[in-house]
Amino acid sequence: FPFLMEERRVCRVLLLGPPGCGKTTVLRDAAKRLAGDGIRVSVCDEREELFPEDAAQAGLDVMRGIDKPTAIQMLLRAMSPQAIFCDEIGDMRDVRALLDAARCGVGLAASAHAGVFDDVLHRPVLRALYEAGAFERYLLLGRHGKLAAAYDAEGKPISGGGIEHEKRRGDGHDFAQRDRLCSGGRRNAPRPLGAGHAPNPDADKRHDSL
């Protein structure tokens, strides 16, 4: 699982990809692998899709059917996780919960529907996470769950890790075009966590079904 670990520390990673590309499977396998390596992994499985079966044998602490804000707070207080895995990000309440976890120094792994990295900047919920510096890495899945591209916290491509290097629209190489995607002709650069930046809870009052 390239780009997920850095010197025994679990990074904050957002897994991107179209529906049906295998995001859930990749998250499930990664959580099991980390737990097998002795890392304390907790799972927020709101939709009961990540671990519908008993996860105790995998050494995971799983909370099923509970909304992410509630589950993440309970996991942080009770389980002392080194990493929290959760299913697809939904709305601004999820954003705030993930930022709380990130500021506690916990590794994160979550997923969201996106065909290309630039979709992150077009969707208010994902853009709020990007601008707040919630994730250190963005991993884009291609066909059959293969890693098609990887980006750092600023959206710059990362090489290595078995990336397929598929040539796709908006693959992150036209930074001038990406800068124009945001209102006013420019985007807000990601800020380090703790820099005083908070997402606007009114940015997306509707549920952004990912």
Q: What spans do the regions from the language model cover?
A:
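Glycine-rich phosphate-binding P-loop
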Residues: C11-A30
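P-loop NTPase switch/communication element
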Residues: L34-R77
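Conserved P-loop NTPase nucleotide-binding/switch module
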Residues: S80-P81, D87-R143
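Conserved P-loop NTPase
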Residues: E136-L193
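Intrinsic-disorder-associated, low-complexity terminal segments enriched in Asp/Asn/His/Tyr and depleted
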Residues: D174, D179, N200-D204, D208
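Glycine- and other small-residue-rich loops at beta-strand/loop junctions that grip anionic moieties
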Residues: L16-P19, D61-G65, C86-E88
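Conserved catalytic network of the ASCE P-loop NTPase/AAA+ motor domain
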Residues: E6-R8, L34-G36, D54-A55, L75-M79, ...
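P-loop NTP-binding catalytic core
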Residues: F1-R12
